[in-house]
Structure formats: structure tokens, C-alpha cells
Design a protein with these regions (language model features):
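Post-cleavage N-terminal segment of exported redox proteins
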Residues: 7-86, 92, 132-222
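Extracytoplasmic electron-transfer domains, predominantly the class I c-type cytochrome c fold
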Residues: 36, 79-84, 116-169, 253-307
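Solvent-exposed, polar/charged alpha-helical surfaces in well-ordered, non-transmembrane soluble domains
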Residues: 83-87, 107, 144, 182, ...
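Sec/Tat-exported extracytoplasmic proteins
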Residues: 89-96, 110-113, 149-157, 188-195, ...
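Conserved non-transmembrane functional hotspots
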Residues: 310-330
Length: 330
């Protein structure tokens, strides 16, 4: 039997994961100086600097920091860059179409514009960069990391016709200097005001299946995952995984040509399982077990999705993770 608020939770996901979580508007109050996040007056229902992981219909779209209404931002170019980054974050396919080949927005995984507990929150994230990236085998800047998301989660490589001829596709792909990347960086740096470089972010890494609870990939059953998906997930995501629309709101596709490509982090079994386990369903995250989340993840990542054409350049200096099921193993 489904939990008592399942249908309500489904409604919230439909509306909250659609990407555009706030209207396009300009701040109405006079500008005031920026202040560190820890001094910002958060409402009682918020958990520290984040939205609580459990929420209600009334609070499902709350934002501790909303640059479209925050009076601390003025009419300067710097403030407008933050606002543009927020718009790209919440409607990536619409606001950064040249680098978003599918229908995935940053907001689809990083809920509440990157400000929700246990939903891959990004508050303070700028303080951790540069950071070593195992897949690339080198240190990444924040902008490098954003580029990686465009290439993989937003499938910017989907427009490449000849991956062997760099001259034919170089102009199609984002760089750290691209204006969309710089705008997203400005928004994330704004979310990170008050955090010193190297800051310990206690909410980082919460979306992980504990290593001791990970089921070997070969023991996971896509058919069992499908049964769970049909019972637990279709209210919001539909039987075809493409999302059920209510008005102009729709969850992002979980597979197919408009989903993330097979080089994305969500294309890894345990990574996606951690998101499912702790961030879903939208109003009642955490009601699925570790096993259920992993089985559902195995089902989703047994589906076809766009191919990342440069997988052969990944993990050249680090071992290939055992849950990277779309990669060719030596």
C-alpha cells in the first residue's frame, strides 16, 4: 500500500521539478549591502541555510535565497549576472538552449534551486573549489565543474555529428569562459557568500548509499526495479519516464533522447540511487529503502539514453567505478 500522502507528494514533484520555480521579475526593494549567509534571517521552518528535506505543499517552493526578490542585489551588472545564473539554473533548457540538448535543468536534481537538504544542495559549494575530479584526473575549478554538467547532464554533446573532428564541434560546446557558465558560477558564488575556502559543508555528501549497503551491480534486477518504479514513481514520472505534466510543469525525462547522457553522474547506479533514496518522493523523501532505491536506479540506468562521445577519455588515471554501467570495461 502506498504511503498516505503519496498522491500529494506526486503533485508537488510535478510542479516543483519543472525548472522554473519563480516568476521572472525584478527586485522591488532598494539594494542593501550583501551579508554572509549565516547572518541571513531564515524563517523557522528552514533547516540551517537550507530548505528542510521534508516539506509541504505550502513550503515546497520556498527559497532561503531568491535573487529575483532579494533586496541585497541592486541594478549592477554583477547582481544581474547572479539573477541570470538563477534563471539558467531553474530553466536550463530555456535559458541556456545552445548548451542544453535535452530537457534537464540544474533544478531537476539540485532541488529548490540548490538550497534543499539532502537534494544535492549547493549552498557554500564555491568554497570547495578547486577540487580534484577523479573522472578527469585533475583539479577542477567551479567553472570546469559547470562545464561538465552541461556536457553530460544537459547533454551539450548531443549536437556533435563527428566526435573525431574537433574543428567541427568545438564551437558547439561550453567552455569555462562561456557567458552561461559564468552566470551559473555567479549564482553559486552568491549562494556561497560567507563560506571560507575549504569550508566543511555538513550537508555535502548526504545523498550517498553507504558502501556497506551497496548491492553488487550484478545482483540488481532491472525487472524488480521496474516493478517498484511502476508502483512508486509513475504518479509523477509516468510509465514512460518522461514526466506527467500539470499545466506548464513536468519532471525531467529519466531516460530517452531528452534525458542526461550516459557519461553523466546520474548514469551511475549508486549515484542515482542516492538521489532517489534521500530526495524522493518530493514531500516525503527517505521512505524508500536502500535496496528499493538501488533497484529503481538499476531499472532507470538499463534504459537507453544519449551517448557521451568522449567516455574513452574518462578515468584514464583512476579506476573505473563499478557502477558505471554504460562504460566499456577493459
Amino acid at each position: 500500500m502506498r504511503p498516505p500522502f503519496w498522491n500529494l507528494a506526486g503533485l508537488a514533484v510535478l510542479m516543483a521539478t519543472a525548472g522554473a520555480c519563480a516568476p521572472d521579475r525584478s527586485p522591488e526593494s532598494p539594494a542593501v549591502p550583501l551579508m554572509p549567509l549565516e547572518s541571513y534571517p531564515y524563517p523557522e521552518e528552514l533547516s540551517g541555510p537550507l530548505i528542510a528535506s521534508w516539506t509541504t505543499i505550502q513550503t515546497a517552493w520556498d527559497l532561503p535565497l531568491d535573487p529575483l526578490t532579494d533586496p541585497r542585489l541592486d541594478d549592477s551588472a554583477e547582481s544581474e549576472e547572479v539573477r541570470r545564473g538563477f534563471r539558467i539554473f531553474t530553466d536550463t533548457a530555456g535559458e541556456a538552449a545552445r548548451f542544453a540538448h535535452g530537457q534537464i535543468s540544474c533544478n531537476n536534481c539540485h532541488l529548490n534551486a540548490g538550497q534543499r537538504e539532502r537534494a544535492l544542495p549547493l549552498v557554500g559549494v564555491a568554497a570547495i573549489f578547486p577540487e580534484y575530479n577523479r573522472r578527469a584526473g585533475r583539479d577542477f575549478t567551479l567553472e570546469d565543474r559547470i562545464v561538465g554538467c552541461f556536457l553530460r547532464s544537459q547533454n551539450a554533446t548531443g549536437r556533435i555529428e563527428s566526435p573525431d573532428d574537433e574543428d567541427t564541434y568545438r564551437h558547439l560546446l561550453p567552455t569555462p569562459e562561456a557567458e552561461e557558465v559564468q552566470a551559473l558560477s555567479a549564482y553559486l558564488r552568491w549562494l556561497s557568500l560567507g563560506y571560507e575556502p575549504g569550508a566543511n559543508l555538513p550537508w555535502r555528501g548526504q545523498n550517498m548509499i553507504a558502501p556497506e549497503n551497496r548491492i553488487p551491480v550484478e545482483d540488481l534486477d532491472p525487472e524488480q526495479g521496474e516493478a517498484l518504479f511502476m508502483d512508486r514513481c509513475t504518479n509523477c514520472h509516468g510509465e514512460d519516464g518522461q514526466g506527467v505534466a500539470i499545466g506548464d510543469k513536468r519532471p525531467a525525462p529519466l531516460w530517452g533522447p531528452d534525458s542526461w547522457n550516459d557519461g553523466a553522474g546520474a548514469a551511475r547506479i549508486y549515484t542515482l540511487a542516492g538521489i532517489i533514496r534521500y530526495a524522493m518522493p518530493y514531500l516525503e523523501p527517505g521512505i524508500l529503502t536502500d535496496e528499493e532505491a538501488q533497484q529503481i536506479s538499476r531499472f532507470i540506468n538499463a534504459k537507453s539514453r544519449p551517448s557521451f562521445p568522449f567516455k574513452a577519455q574518462d578515468y584514464l588515471t583512476e579506476p573505473l567505478p563499478i557502477d558505471s554501467v554504460y562504460y566499456q570495461r577493459p
